[in-house]
């Protein structure tokens, strides 16, 4: 390559980089501001629910109206995260801008009346809808739209959790299992950092988690404990199986609601009756809402699972039940924060069984169950480092990667595609959506059941 050609090539790279910075930073500022508004509203809604316990009885009405409004005015927005992933894989009509206000209001309403849901799905949809609007105004081509949508995902994720590096990697990793979308690396990183900074500039503070195990020991002098590593490996397998069960049961519950209740607005009414019944059956409301904090110190919360003095064996299971019923019926929000709760609770229980540090295992479960349910082990490992520190990197990596392998070809995102199979023995064509893999698996299972009945 001649000198002139070399400098011309570098100039084109710099020009492309400058263009993307100019495009994604304003978009990320908008997304970060919306995420700040969302987190502030969510905090107020959660506080209001604790202050006014009777709000739970409005759950059936809220759910009915929410789905009814989506049916009449939110057409094209109902696909949620799966719609955004589909648009990145195969750009079509784009992500409607109305998705942003619809998902923000409906998620806050879900939490106000006690639905067990999260916030990641809302943040990603805020990012995707704003990014799509910027793409339409900028008249971008299909390839550029894909990159901007990925940057929108990174912005939403990075801002809502305060983990910009994990947000950038999540946007590259979540689309296709086993394959990273490196063409969007710089735009996604810039968007995640800008959105996170904007969210902080609005005064939003994120929860800080503390792991007492090995506190004060620099990461550079850390040496592995072989027995503890073996326990972490076993826990990683269990986290992956838990993630697989959560994903499969979520999709099965959603299909069951659609099969047995054709009128969509009635589904959340039925779910509300189930949830309120469970509250009175169990005698507690601790599995409602986000589950990050509670004014009642005896309630199970994500923060509480990091306390070595607390042992809770079944909170992870009940939180999974409450979340699956809530989201599969049509209430809005994300699955990720409930997955954090489920993982931290399961980690706390496994620590008691294995004789391991409770705070460390709560942290491992926090990220590993998420890794298994979304097939994003690298992003989750990085998130663990951003939230809990680099001292525990090896344990975080082992837990996340084993959970990813053991969760199989399942995902909470049915639009996610298979790039590289997790096992060489899996004869699944590349770029097959998880939705098709699951449908094939269900048909095969039904066929085997019919054959067994005939015999």
Swiss-Prot record:
Effect of loss of the gene: Deletion of the gene causes serious deficiencies in nodule development, nodulation competitiveness and nitrogen fixation on Phaseolus vulgaris plants. Deletion mutant is unable to form stable symbiosomes.
SUPFAM superfamilies tied to this protein: Clc chloride channel (SSF81340)
Transmembrane segments: 20-40, 54-74, 147-167, 184-204, 222-242, 262-282, 322-342, 350-370, 382-402
Superkingdom to which the source organism belongs: Bacteria
One Gene Ontology term, aspect cellular component: plasma membrane
Database matches in Pfam families: Voltage_CLC (PF00654)
Gene3D superfamilies, A to Z: Clc chloride channel
Major location category of this protein: membrane
Keywords in alphabetical order: Cell inner membrane, Cell membrane, Membrane, Transmembrane, Transmembrane helix
MF terms (GO), sorted A to Z: chloride transmembrane transporter activity
CDD domains on file: ClC_sycA_like
UniProt membrane topology term: Multi-pass membrane protein
Localization terms from the record: Cell inner membrane
General function of this protein: Essential for the establishment of a fully developed nitrogen-fixing root nodule symbiosis.
Membership in a protein family: Belongs to the chloride channel (TC 2.A.49) family.
The protein, known as: Symbiosis-assisting ClC homolog
UniProt organism field: Rhizobium tropici
């Amino acid at each position: 390559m001649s000198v002139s050609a070399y400098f011309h090539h570098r100039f084109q790279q710099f020009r492309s980089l400058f263009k993307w910075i100019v495009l994604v930073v304003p978009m990320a500022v908008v997304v970060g501001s919306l995420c700040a508004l969302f987190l502030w509203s969510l905090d107020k809604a959660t506080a209001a629910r604790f202050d006014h316990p009777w709000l739970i009885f409005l759950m059936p009405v809220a759910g009915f109206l929410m789905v009814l409004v989506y049916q009449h005015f939110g057409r094209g927005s109902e696909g949620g995260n799966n719609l955004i992933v589909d648009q990145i894989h195969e750009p079509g009509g784009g992500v409607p801008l109305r998705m942003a206000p619809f998902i923000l209001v409906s998620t806050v309403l879900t939490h106000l009346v006690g639905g067990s849901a999260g916030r990641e799905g809302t943040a990603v949809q805020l990012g995707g809808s704003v990014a799509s609007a910027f793409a339409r105004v900028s008249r971008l081509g299909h390839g550029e739209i894909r990159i901007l949508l990925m940057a929108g995902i990174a912005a939403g994720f990075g801002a809502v959790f305060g983990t910009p590096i994990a947000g950038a990697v999540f946007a590259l990793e979540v689309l296709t299992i086993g394959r990273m979308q490196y063409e969007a690396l710089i735009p996604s990183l810039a968007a995640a950092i800008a959105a996170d900074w904007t969210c902080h500039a609005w005064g939003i503070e994120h929860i800080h988690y503390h792991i007492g195990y090995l506190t004060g020991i620099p990461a550079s002098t850390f040496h592995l404990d072989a027995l503890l590593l073996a326990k972490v490996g076993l826990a990683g397998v269990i986290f992956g199986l838990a993630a697989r069960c959560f994903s499969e049961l979520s999709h099965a519950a959603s299909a069951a609601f659609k099969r047995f209740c054709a009128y969509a607005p009635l589904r959340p009414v039925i779910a509300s009756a189930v949830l309120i019944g469970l509250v009175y059956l169990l005698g507690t409301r601790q599995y409602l809402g986000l589950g990050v904090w509670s004014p009642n110190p005896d309630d199970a919360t994500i923060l509480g699972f990091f306390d070595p003095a607390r042992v809770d064996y079944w909170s992870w299971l009940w939180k999974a039940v409450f979340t699956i019923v809530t989201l599969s019926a049509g209430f809005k929000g994300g699955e990720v924060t409930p997955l954090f709760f489920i993982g931290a609770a399961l980690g706390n229980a496994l620590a008691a069984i294995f004789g391991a540090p409770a705070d460390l295992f709560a942290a491992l479960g926090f990220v590993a169950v998420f890794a298994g349910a979304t097939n994003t082990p690298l992003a989750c490992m990085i998130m663990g480092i951003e939230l809990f520190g680099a001292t525990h990197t090896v344990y975080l990596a082992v837990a996340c990667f084993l959970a990813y392998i053991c969760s199989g070809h399942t995902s909470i995102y049915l639009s996610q595609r298979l790039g590289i199979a997790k096992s060489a023995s899996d004869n699944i064509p590349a770029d097959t959506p998880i939705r098709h893999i699951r449908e094939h698996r269900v048909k095969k299972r039904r066929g085997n059941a019919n054959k067994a009945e005939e015999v």
